[in-house]
Regions:
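Non-catalytic C-terminal accessory/binding modules of secreted extracellular proteins
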Residues: 41-199
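The catalytic-center signature of Zn2+-dependent metalloproteases
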Residues: 1-37
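Residue-level detector of conserved, well-ordered beta-strand and adjacent loop positions
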Residues: 16, 82, 204
Length: 206
């Protein structure tokens, strides 16, 4: 069915099921995309290969709060990388790590609330690290444990996201995004990775 093909943000976004977290008494916190639309944060768009660190939203550091990887063939299509750590609005039962969102902004879809109506070209979707888009376990029961597998490196220790990995940074416009990330790590609540240059893997950055 179409419902089986469409992958909504589910509990990851307050614009979807996230508003019902804890029966609506503690809805999920705003995503990096939502926070950027509110003007609360600025999405960092790297211009050169290098080593990048992402801090959680509630930590005051010089690191960016979220990273944007734009499709050069279509500036309105991009990936957003953010650091999800347990806090007031992000429950520990959903895990911790880097959440990846694929945005394909088409004005009319946002205007008429049809963002994800087309299963072949969804406008707002989570890229699950375990490549499993279902919140249901092997027994067919809904489980918040399934959400932990969405995060990088997460429960499956997924340390890369490129045009060729599974999941991958596929794009609707053009052939490839061409902006791979390697050596994704999480240490003391900080997400780090090497952007575009695999030769940086293993180098100790301070």
């Amino acid at each position: 069915s179409v419902a089986d093909l469409i992958q909504s943000p589910d509990y990851w976004s307050v614009m979807d099921y996230g508003q019902y977290m804890y029966d609506g008494y503690a809805p999920i916190g705003y995503s990096a995309y939502e926070r950027s639309l509110m003007g609360w944060i600025k999405l960092y768009e790297p211009q050169e290969p290098g080593y990048i660190s992402i801090s959680p939203f509630d930590k005051a550091t010089n690191n960016p709060k979220a990273v944007l990887l734009r499709n050069d063939e279509n500036p309105a299509e991009y990936y957003i990388l953010e650091n999800r750590q347990p806090s007031t609005w992000f429950p520990s039962l959903m895990g911790n790590g880097m959440l990846v969102t694929h945005i394909d902004y088409v004005t009319s879809k946002w205007q008429y609330n049809t963002v994800n109506n087309d299963p072949n070209r969804q406008g707002y979707q989570i890229v699950p690290a375990d490549n499993n888009k279902s919140p249901y376990n092997d027994e067919g029961k809904f489980s918040f444990e399934c959400f932990k597998g969405d995060l990088f490196p997460g429960t499956y220790n997924m340390t890369e996201l490129t045009d060729d990995t599974s999941p991958s940074t596929n794009v609707y416009a053009g052939n490839k995004l061409g902006k791979p990330i390697y050596d994704i790590k999480e240490e003391e609540g900080i997400i780090t990775f090497c952007y575009k240059d695999p030769s940086l893997v293993g180098i100790n950055f301070v």
